Each structure stands twice: as structure tokens, then as C-alpha cells.
């Protein structure tokens, strides 16, 4: 009979379509699905698709008022994960019409908004997204990008050096500005607010901005180099955040900062648009990311958060170090570093890249290595990240036995020695320690740093690793 038939139906009958040919305009997703015992992978994969597109738990009469075939997400392939008896990678295609243009917020609300609480699933992780060209073109992306930043700063041919001011909380604005000045005059390109420095009773944001601007201009006058400090504009409301960015622009400083996950994608995109319109660079901190991305079987991989940030907008983003104190396995890290910087990235499962991604000339984002790094790590960082990166030495600058400025000198000397050696054809991975020792013979600041940190190691096994192939 023709008409509406009530009742509960199996998701796989509607949403599991292995014969589907994906379109260039589809958003493609790779989910790591761990079904409850007794739930077949096709049903679990189709359930994910249904909840994140047109489905609900029962047949509804309003299904007949639209074209479900046009709007539904489709699970078009499922594959078992090697070495895991109950995990599957489910590949899903979402039609582009399901998403609002230029909105990372809407994209995530649709794809990961409700489905992670599904009872049929023990765990679920979004491993990767393929963003189609048609959707990318609805986003502004990074305010400026890697090349424009180099032109603004007049710095070429090497990574840029930074330092997070410590202690992160408790300094007065004047003492904070003094620490900034010492680091910048010693040879760093940038200093940085920590992610939780906003506007607390011991240091209100306006005072911090003023003293940091004074430090920047004094260091610039003494060194002849353009300097910057990542002024954290993150605030409790979008209006307050923009007010802080406006004040930074009025001071004439080159860069502001945002905590994009705690601040939210709507706020981040708003700030990125303001920065593009007003010539400010935008540094992005990923505070809270490990809550979402650290567990291998549940949550969302950082490569997805990195792609989302490139759409939403940011000129730098923290991306792990491989060698420091924070989580980050080498092949995985290099995979999403390429997704941040390059214009075209081929599918490469050996680096965790599930889809070929074309960014159609959207500006790139410079990865920031930060967390537990010091001068002995400089050869590895230069070799791993190349020139288009930012190396942030917080304790590795401020912990120098002679003070901030000598700490900055040590890092700058180590960096320039590594870049020079690399340009001469030396292998940083093999000769790194020798290169640092040679440079320390003529730099007492570097020699002192080498002595302090010669025994420091962070040797822990990464939690998030690649699947066996």
C-alpha cells in the first residue's frame, strides 16, 4: 500500500549503501566505530550516519515531505581495524546541502553533535574529514597565512622563535612586560601569553597589553628586528574579545592570540575576520584539545581539529613537538602539520591521513612546537618542522641560569647554527648534538644552557598511535 508506515526500522536498510559513488561535493568522514557486543558494524555505522544527518529512531510521517535520498548521510564502506577485534573504520558521505556555508560550528554540530552518546556504540572517534572544494570556498580561512606573515615581519629562511612567559599566573603587568622585553632583546621573535592568562585580579588585560607593547617597541629599537607578543584576547564574551583585539590594533602590535577550543569556533571565526580586516596576525592555542583527541578509540583526532582551525582561521596553531613533554607521535604529527601548511595533501594511511585534501589556495597555518623543549632539541625540531614553523621555548628560555635574555641568546644561536648546518648539507638527525656543541664553544650563553639541560628527557610511550598496516 502507498503511504506512511509507522514503526522502528533498521538503520542499515536506509543508511548503509556500499554501492554509493561519492561526489566531489560530499563531505567525507572516517569514523573509528566500536559497537556494543552483538551490534553488526554495518548497523553501527549506519546509525552514526542517520543521527548525524536526516535520521531519528523511528519512521516519522514528515519523512514524506522531503527527499531523504538527497539529504541523508550514507555509510558507503566499513573495514575492520587490524589488531583490534571489535573496531571498524566506517566511511561516511554527507551531502553538502546539510551544512551552513562558512560555519565550522554547524559542520561539527551536524557531524559529531549528538551521535557520540549513542547506546549502540561503546566508543566512537572521528579520525578524519575530507572537506570538498565547494565548501572550503565559503570560508575566509587564516587571516594572513605563512608567506604574508614572513613579509610583515621581514624574517625569512628559518623557523621563528618564541617563549611563553612564566610563571604563567601571578606576575604583575609591569614585571610581565619586563620579562617580555628581556626575551625579545635577547633574540627571540615573539613572546607569548599563556593560554589561561586572560584578565585576572593580579593582572588586568589592559595593563598587560600596555606594558607588553612598551617592551616590544623598546626591543625593536635596540635590535632593529620586528618583534611581537601574542596578546591573549580570549574573553568571556565575543564582544569583550573583539574589544581587546581593537585595543591591540590601536597599540600597533602585530599579533593577538585566541584559545580556539575553549573560546569556541564562532568566536574564533569572528576574531579571524577582524584580524584579516585590520592587519593583525592571529596565534591559536589548542587548550582543551587532549580532552577531545587523546584517547585512541573515542573523541576526535587532532587532525580534524587542525582542519577545522584552518577553515575557521588562525595564522599559528600549537601542534605538538614530537620530542618534548606533550603527546605527539612523529608520523601522525607530520601528517597534520602538512594538512595545516600545504595546499594539497595525498591520502597516506601511514601518517594517519585518510583522504586526499585539496585546500584550493586557502592560506596555510604555521605549526607551533611548544612544551618541554630546550636547546638540545633544536636540531630535531629544525629537521622535523622545517622553516615554516614556530618553536616556543618557555622554560627553555626563562630557565637559563643567567636569566631571560641569555636564555633567548642561547636559543637563537642554537637555531642559527642548525639552519646553517642544514643549508651546508649536514644531517641534523645524525649530527645534531655535535652541531650544538660546536656552536656552544663560541657562545657562553649556549654553553650554559647545554649544561643545565643535558640530562632532561621525556621518554613516555604515546597514547595515540597509528594502526598496524
From Swiss-Prot:
Keywords, comma-separated and alphabetical: Calvin cycle, Carbon dioxide fixation, Chloroplast, Disulfide bond, Lyase, Magnesium, Metal-binding, Methylation, Monooxygenase, Oxidoreductase, Photorespiration, Photosynthesis, Plastid
How is the polypeptide modified once translated?
The disulfide bond which can form in the large chain dimeric partners within the hexadecamer appears to be associated with oxidative stress and protein turnover.
In this chain, the site described as Transition state stabilizer is at 325
Major enzyme class? lyase
CC annotations in GO: chloroplast
Query: Per its database record, what is this protein's job?
Result: RuBisCO catalyzes two reactions: the carboxylation of D-ribulose 1,5-bisphosphate, the primary event in carbon dioxide fixation, as well as the oxidative fragmentation of the pentose substrate in the photorespiration process. Both reactions occur simultaneously and in competition at the same active site.
Mind telling me which HAMAP family this protein's record contains? RuBisCO_L_type1
The UniProt family comment states: Belongs to the RuBisCO large chain family. Type I subfamily.
Subunit and partners: Heterohexadecamer of 8 large chains and 8 small chains; disulfide-linked. The disulfide link is formed within the large subunit homodimers.
Q: In its UniProt entry, what is this protein called?
A: Ribulose bisphosphate carboxylase large chain
**UniProt organism field:** Antirhea lucida
Amino acid at each position: 500500500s502507498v503511504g506512511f508506515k509507522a514503526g522502528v526500522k533498521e538503520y542499515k536498510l536506509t543508511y548503509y549503501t556500499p554501492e554509493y559513488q561519492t561526489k566531489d561535493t560530499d563531505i567525507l568522514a572516517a569514523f573509528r566505530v566500536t559497537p556494543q557486543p552483538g551490534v553488526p558494524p554495518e548497523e553501527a555505522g549506519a546509525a552514526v550516519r542517520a543521527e548525524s544527518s536526516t535520521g531519528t529512531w523511528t519512521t516519522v510521517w514528515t519523512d514524506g515531505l522531503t527527499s531523504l535520498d538527497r539529504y541523508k548521510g550514507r555509510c558507503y564502506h566499513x573495514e575492520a581495524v587490524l589488531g583490534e577485534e571489535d573496531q571498524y573504520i566506517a566511511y561516511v558521505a554527507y551531502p553538502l546541502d546539510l551544512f551552513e556555508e562558512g560555519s565550522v560550528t554547524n559542520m561539527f554540530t551536524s557531524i559529531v553533535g549528538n551521535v557520540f552518546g549513542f547506546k549502540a556504540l561503546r566508543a566512537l572517534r572521528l579520525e578524519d574529514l575530507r572537506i570538498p572544494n565547494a565548501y572550503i570556498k565559503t570560508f575566509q580561512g587564516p587571516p594572513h597565512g605563512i608567506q604574508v606573515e614572513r613579509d610583515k615581519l621581514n624574517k625569512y629562511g628559518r623557523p621563528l622563535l618564541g617563549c611563553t612567559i612564566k610563571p604563567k599566573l601571578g606576575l604583575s603587568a609591569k614585571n610581565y612586560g619586563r620579562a617580555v622585553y628581556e626575551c625579545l632583546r635577547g633574540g627571540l621573535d615573539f613572546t607569548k601569553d599563556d593560554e589561561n592568562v586572560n584578565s585576572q585580579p593580579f593582572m588586568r588585560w589592559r595593563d598587560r597589553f600596555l606594558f607588553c607593547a612598551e617592551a616590544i617597541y623598546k626591543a625593536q629599537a635596540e635590535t632593529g628586528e620586528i618583534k611581537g607578543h601574542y596578546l591573549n584576547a580570549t574573553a568571556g564574551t565575543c564582544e569583550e574579545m573583539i574589544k581587546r583585539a581593537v585595543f591591540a590594533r590601536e597599540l600597533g602590535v602585530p599579533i593577538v592570540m585566541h584559545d580556539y577550543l575553549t573560546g569556541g569556533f564562532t568566536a574564533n571565526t569572528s576574531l579571524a575576520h577582524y584580524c584579516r580586516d585590520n592587519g593583525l596576525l592571529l596565534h591559536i592555542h589548542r587548550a582543551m584539545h587532549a580532552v577531545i583527541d587523546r584517547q585512541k578509540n573515542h573523541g576526535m583526532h587532532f587532525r580534524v581539529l587542525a582542519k577545522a582551525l584552518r577553515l575557521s582561521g588562525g595564522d599559528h596553531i600549537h601542534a605538538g613537538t614530537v620530542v618534548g613533554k606533550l603527546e605527539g607521535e612523529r608520523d601522525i604529527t607530520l601528517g597534520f602539520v602538512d594538512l595545516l601548511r600545504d595546499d594539497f595533501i595525498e591520502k597516506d594511511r601511514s601518517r594517519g591521513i585518510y583522504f586526499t585534501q585539496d585546500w584550493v589556495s586557502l592560506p596555510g597555518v604555521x605549526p607551533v612546537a611548544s612544551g618541554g623543549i630546550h636547546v638540545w632539541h633544536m636540531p630535531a625540531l629544525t629537521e622535523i618542522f622545517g622553516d615554516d614553523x614556530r618553536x616556543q621555548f618557555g622554560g627553555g628560555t626563562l630557565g637559563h641560569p643567567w636569566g631571560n635574555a641569555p636564555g633567548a641568546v642561547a636559543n637563537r644561536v642554537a637555531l642559527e647554527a642548525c639552519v646553517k648546518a642544514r643549508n651546508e648539507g649536514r644531517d641534523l638527525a645524525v649530527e645534531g648534538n655535535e652541531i650544538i656543541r660546536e656552536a656552544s664553544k663560541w657562545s657562553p650563553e649556549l654553553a650554559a644552557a647545554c649544561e643545565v639541560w643535558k640530562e632532561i628527557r621525556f621518554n613516555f610511550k604515546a597514547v595515540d598511535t597509528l594502526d598496524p598496516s
